[in-house]
Every structure is written in C-alpha cells, then in structure tokens.
C-alpha cells in the first residue's frame, strides 16, 4: 500500500474557505449512532482478536449487549425529545437479532449506512471478491429490512482494507 493514498488534496486550515450554515447557524453537528452486534464467540481472524480477553468474553459481550437492550432506547428518546434525526452506522446483523431496533429507526426516518454484518467479523485478510460479497450482502440486508438503498460503508470495527480506505 502507498504511504499516502492521495484521497484528497492537502489544504491547511488557515487557507480554507469560510463555511456558512443554513439560517446563519454557528454550529452544525451530525449524530451517527453505531448500532452494533457483537458475537459471544466470533470466528477467528489472524490479524486481530475481537475481544481483549479469552473467548467467550462474557464481561465484554455484556457491556456491548447493553447498547441494544437499554442504551439505544435511552439515546433514541433523547434524540426524539430534541428533534434530532440519526444517521445509523449499522451492523446489519441487528436486522435479524433485534428487528425492533430497526423498526424504531425506520419509524423516525433515520438514515442507514452499513457497518458490516457483525462488529466482531473483520475485513482484514479478505480477498477483493470476499469483501465485495460482504458489502453487497450488507446492502441487500438493509434494503430488505428498511426499504433504503445504502450509499455508504464503514468497515466493521474500522477494519479498512486498501479498497475501503474512504
């Protein structure tokens, strides 16, 4: 891989044009909740272990499972209270494991982009064909469960490859 992938030109902060937001707003923010699913005993990957402790890591799994059982619902209620729409970074396994979560996002017209199938299955070491199949499967799963056609991809656990740097 090249030391600089040349995805964008260098532009120092002081040389950038001034950004103006609609209605004269001084601040803009984007709320992109990661709605993820971690397997208790994921398949191995020689490049990275999914858990910091031996498998099954019940402690780490339960911390992460809290998000779908309690954290998501609390976050959604707070966002709704303040009129904030989400852009969901989604492990698409949530569509099968917790369809109620997906239904609530759809009901609120949140936008989805794929964050892989499971957050414990990495793209490191995949061939281009394997990675393409993973992405196509994720996009098809989200469209089936939400009706949305995806335009974005964020590799699971940020395990980008040379093909998915941006």
Question: What do the predicted segments below correspond to?
Answer:
Residues 1-152, 157-166:
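Catalytic alpha-helical scaffold of carbohydrate-active enzymes acting on polysaccharides/glycoconjugates
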């Amino acid at each position: 891989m090249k030391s600089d992938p040349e995805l964008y030109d260098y532009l120092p902060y002081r040389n950038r044009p001034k950004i103006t937001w609609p209605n004269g707003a001084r601040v803009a923010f984007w709320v992109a909740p990661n709605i993820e699913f971690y397997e208790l005993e994921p398949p191995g990957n020689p490049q990275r272990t999914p858990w910091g402790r031996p498998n099954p890591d019940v402690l780490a799994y339960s911390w992460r499972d809290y998000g779908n059982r309690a954290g998501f619902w609390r976050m959604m209620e707070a966002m709704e209270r303040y009129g904030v729409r989400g852009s969901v970074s989604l492990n698409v396994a949530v569509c099968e494991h917790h369809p109620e979560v997906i239904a609530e996002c759809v009901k609120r017209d949140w936008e989805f982009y794929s964050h892989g199938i499971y957050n414990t299955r990495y793209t490191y070491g995949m061939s281009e064909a394997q990675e393409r199949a993973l992405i196509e499967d994720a996009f098809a799963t989200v469209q089936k469960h939400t009706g949305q056609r995806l335009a974005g991809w964020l590799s699971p656990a940020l395990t980008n490859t040379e093909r998915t740097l941006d």
